[in-house]
From Swiss-Prot:
Keywords: Ribonucleoprotein, Ribosomal protein, RNA-binding, rRNA-binding
CC per GO annotation: ribonucleoprotein complex; ribosome
Name of this chain's protein: Small ribosomal subunit protein uS11
Function as written in the Swiss-Prot or TrEMBL entry: Located on the platform of the 30S subunit, it bridges several disparate RNA helices of the 16S rRNA. Forms part of the Shine-Dalgarno cleft in the 70S ribosome.
One GO term (biological process): translation
Subunit structure: Part of the 30S ribosomal subunit. Interacts with proteins S7 and S18. Binds to IF-3.
Amino acid sequence: MAKPAARTRKKVKKTVVDGIAHIHASFNNTIVTITDRQGNALSWATSGGSGFRGSRKSTPFAAQIAAERAGQAALEYGLKNLDVNVKGPGPGRESAVRALNACGYKIASITDVTPIPHNGCRPPKKRRV
């Protein structure tokens, strides 16, 4: 006797109105993660994952493309308002924020959460080019 087909419930997408965009801009790459208020990730994108390799990963344009990809993916959740947390000294900081603004999000606040050591680890030696 054949078993009856198991019914699967349709997965319901949750709707989130307010979210947080975490932008981690290092010297080598830019990572953009959009979360809800509790910190659950809704979408993310990186410069390297957006098709840029090598030194082109660390450009402001690559950060802009990564922010656009993360922003478009998070629009499916009904996201409207964003708080932006920017971390790191990289070149993609500002262009990523501008790209999120261009996606149609209302940016409520921009916060710099770059960790600053109280004389912790020794920094890398300066480059001689």
